[in-house]
Structures are given as structure tokens and as C-alpha cells.
UniProtKB/Swiss-Prot annotation:
One protein family per Pfam: COX2
UniProt protein name: Cytochrome c oxidase subunit 2
Task of the protein: Component of the cytochrome c oxidase, the last enzyme in the mitochondrial electron transport chain which drives oxidative phosphorylation. The respiratory chain contains 3 multisubunit complexes succinate dehydrogenase (complex II, CII), ubiquinol-cytochrome c oxidoreductase (cytochrome b-c1 complex, complex III, CIII) and cytochrome c oxidase (complex IV, CIV), that cooperate to transfer electrons derived from NADH and succinate to molecular oxygen, creating an electrochemical gradient over the inner membrane that drives transmembrane transport and the ATP synthase.
Family: Belongs to the cytochrome c oxidase subunit 2 family.
Taxonomic lineage: Eukaryota, Metazoa, Chordata, Craniata, Vertebrata
Cellular component aspect of the GO annotation: mitochondrial inner membrane; respiratory chain complex IV
Cofactor entry: Cu cation
GO molecular function: copper ion binding; cytochrome-c oxidase activity
Transmembrane annotation, as ranges: 15-45, 60-87
Cleavable signal peptide: none
Subunit structure: Component of the cytochrome c oxidase (complex IV, CIV), a multisubunit enzyme composed of 14 subunits. The complex is composed of a catalytic core of 3 subunits MT-CO1, MT-CO2 and MT-CO3, encoded in the mitochondrial DNA, and 11 supernumerary subunits COX4I, COX5A, COX5B, COX6A, COX6B, COX6C, COX7A, COX7B, COX7C, COX8 and NDUFA4, which are encoded in the nuclear genome.
Catalytic activity from the UniProt record: 4 Fe(II)-[cytochrome c] + O2 + 8 H(+)(in) = 4 Fe(III)-[cytochrome c] + 2 H2O + 4 H(+)(out)
One Gene Ontology biological process: ATP synthesis coupled electron transport
Species this protein is from: Gerbilliscus robustus
Length: 227
């Protein structure tokens, strides 16, 4: 859950988000080192009186500043590709949930169960209970079992939407006529908030997403009560 004036990323709840956080730190450190080197060279050029007016060719220098950026790009690309493959890989999901975007609410269908589906609307501000979050609470939360791989099939009934839950490292476009998929897996129980992250009309800001991750036994009891 984000908090006011937060500078960093939200606390990672899934293995994917942990990898994304590590990759962010890895890339940020490379950018910091490059920026420091550039600032140092600029300050050196401004402060020194030494010039090389007679230098017409420098093969060694050109070789270094060609090979070094290539190595840096490889250091960024390899972990990035690894995470991309991890995000696309879904092996033997324990549960499949179909998510449909509408103007302006979400609908969910648990495809492994008969007649287990519902719509999820934002709770208006005047109906919120003490302690509930404005513009983030919904009337029907998505209940999922923790510590199990879950496949989300995401699409849209009308316009472009985007199903995003930052603490789980999820952001998948909901496109009419196209079925995208994402993997959901939580390391711990809790309630995790997200929002539609694609401008989809006048009420775009009123499409929150709430996932409630619970132990498997409690999820089974909930699914029986909903069927």
C-alpha cells in the first residue's frame, strides 16, 4: 500500500515484484555511476587548461568508448530479459480467474468453479466506513489463495483498460477482442490495492482493484459459500 510522499516502490509481495525491485536498484546504480563519471569529466574539462589540438586520431579511446557502453547495455539487458520470461511463464496454475474491464468497473469469473462470478464496483465516498480508503475500496473483493500460482486472463468489453496492482508487480492491458494473461502469486496474506492504469473515459479514476490473499483453507470455505 502506498503512503503520502512515498519515494520508493511499494513493498514487494510477490517473487516477480521482488525481482523488479532488485532490477530497479541494479539499473539505478548503473545510471548513478554513469552520471557521476560524466559530471566528473565535465568538471575536469572546465577546470583544466590542457588541450590536445594536434590529436587527430585515437583508436584506443574510440575502442574503449565503444566496448564499454556495449558491456553496460548487456549488464542491463540480461536481467531484464530474465524477468520478462519469468513474467510470461505460467506453469500449472492452481486457479484461473477471468477479468473483464468495463466502463467503469471490473467483473471477475473463477473459471474452475461453476457460477462463481461477480462485478466489482468502487464504493462511493459517502458510503465508506471508518478506516476504509477513498477511491480504493470496492463492494466485492477478489479473494485468492496465497502462495499458489494463479493465472489471470484479462480482457475488456468496451475500451482499453489496464489491470494493475503495484505491490504484486502486475500491470496488464485489457484490450477488447484480445485475451492477455498474467501470473498472480503472493508470499503473504493481506489486502492489496490497484487501479485501472489506462485512461478509459470520464470515470477512469473510479475503477479500483482490491485483491485479498488468504490461506488456501479459508479460500476453499469462501468458494463454497459463494457457490
Amino acid at each position: 500500500m502506498a503512503y503520502p510522499f512515498q519515494l520508493g516502490l511499494q513493498d514487494a509481495t510477490s517473487p516477480i515484484m521482488e525481482e523488479l525491485t532488485n532490477f530497479h536498484d541494479h539499473t539505478l546504480m548503473i545510471v548513478f555511476l554513469i552520471s557521476s563519471l560524466v559530471l566528473y569529466l565535465i568538471s575536469l574539462m572546465l577546470s583544466t587548461k590542457l588541450i590536445h589540438t594536434s590529436t587527430m586520431d585515437a583508436q584506443e579511446v574510440e575502442t574503449i568508448w565503444t566496448i564499454l557502453p556495449a558491456i553496460i547495455l548487456i549488464m542491463i539487458a540480461l536481467p531484464s530479459l530474465r524477468i520478462l520470461y519469468m513474467m510470461d511463464e505460467i506453469n500449472n496454475p492452481a486457479l484461473t480467474v477471468k477479468t473483464m474491464g468495463h466502463q467503469w468497473y471490473w467483473s471477475y469469473e473463477y473459471t474452475d468453479y461453476e457460477d462463481l462470478s461477480f462485478d466489482s464496483y468502487m464504493i462511493p465516498t459517502n458510503e465508506l466506513k471508518p478506516g476504509e480508503l477513498r477511491l480504493l475500496e470496492v463492494d466485492n473483493r477478489v479473494i485468492l489463495p496465497m502462495e499458489l500460482p494463479i493465472r489471470m486472463l484479462i480482457s475488456s468489453e468496451d475500451v482499453l483498460h489496464s489491470w494493475a496492482v503495484p505491490s504484486l508487480g502486475l500491470k496488464t492491458d485489457a484490450i477488447p477482442g484480445r485475451l492477455n494473461q498474467a501470473t498472480v502469486m503472493s508470499n503473504r496474506p493481506g489486502i492489496f490495492y490497484g487501479q485501472c492504469s489506462e485512461i478509459c473515459g470520464s470515470n477512469h479514476s473510479f475503477m479500483p482493484i482490491v485483491l485479498e490473499m488468504i490461506p488456501l483453507k479459508l479460500f476453499e470455505n469462501w468458494s463454497i459459500s459463494m457457490s
